[in-house]
Amino acid sequence: MDLQQIGPGLFRWAAPHPEWSPGASPGSTADWPQEVGSVLYEAPHATVLIDPLLPPERESFLRELDKRLHRRGRPVTILTTIGFHRRDRDELARRYEASTSRAKKNLPAGVESFPVRRAGETIFWLPEHRALVPGDRIIGSPGGGLRVCPQSWLRYLPNPLTIAQLKQAMGPLLELPVERVLVSHGEPVLADARRALSAALA
């Protein structure tokens, strides 16, 4: 089970997305790296999976995940940042009898949600680790750092935002003491992430 430990009880893993295709034009709807990230957080009273996608070695991964969850003995919660990231949520929810609600009242202690108005996304905040977990609206920038998603990623919305409007909608995230941003697309920012976030939203 190839987990990258971000902090005590906080892990990230990457897996190739089955719908990825090479040669995408920059700024297009397919402009993202082949591997996408998922997060495992051992919250005080639950084990939380965010946007989980099983890797190609799924059976061995599941065996190790079974062991980890059994050892913890906590309920499992699976959270989805955006509809496109349902990924293997339903299979894992059945396997672990997990909650999939992201309503604020149902979130486990240690997890907060920040719906991005009109953007179809909920970004999760893990205060213990000062970590943000976005879906498609904040992504890794080539060469490091962060950027907002391309305009093309917003076209499907009923009332599409401009990039300027999207940045404004995410402005309140800068009020958080962010140290890490665990993006799904691209490389996570694990230090000085507030500076990177501020630059992305400028």
PLM regions and their residue ranges:
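General small-molecule cofactor/ligand-binding pocket signal
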Residues: 11, 99-101, 112-114
